């Protein structure tokens, strides 16, 4: 299965973005994590079926109500066997 790495830029810290990503990932059966970065972005890594990852990416680009997503840098790769979906 593929691996999605998304670096999300905008007003994405302090607005519930990581919890939003976790909720959507779990709804879609994805594994991975969401983590705040020191530069103000959020890194989201997810693994699972390609179709679920593409839908997840759509949600990441929208974000929760209080967020303002300006850009999402995306990289695709091979899965690393992550379990669960964690927020750091």
UniProtKB/Swiss-Prot annotation:
InterPro entries for the chain: Acylphosphatase, Acylphosphatase-like_dom, Acylphosphatase-like_dom_sf
Catalyzed reactions per annotation: an acyl phosphate + H2O = a carboxylate + phosphate + H(+)
Keywords: Hydrolase
Domain (Acylphosphatase-like) ranges: 3-88
EC number: 3.6.1.7
A GO MF label: acylphosphatase activity
Similarity remark: Belongs to the acylphosphatase family.
Protein name: Acylphosphatase
């Amino acid at each position: 299965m593929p691996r999605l790495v998304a670096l999300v830029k905008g007003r994405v810290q302090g607005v519930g973005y990581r919890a939003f990503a976790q909720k959507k990932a779990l709804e879609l059966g994805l594994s991975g994590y969401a983590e705040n970065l020191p530069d103000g972005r959020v890194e989201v890594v997810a693994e699972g079926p390609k179709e679920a990852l593409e839908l997840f990416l759509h949600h990441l680009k929208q974000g929760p109500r209080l967020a303002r997503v300006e850009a999402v840098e995306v990289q695709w790769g091979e899965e690393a066997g992550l379990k669960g979906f964690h927020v750091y």
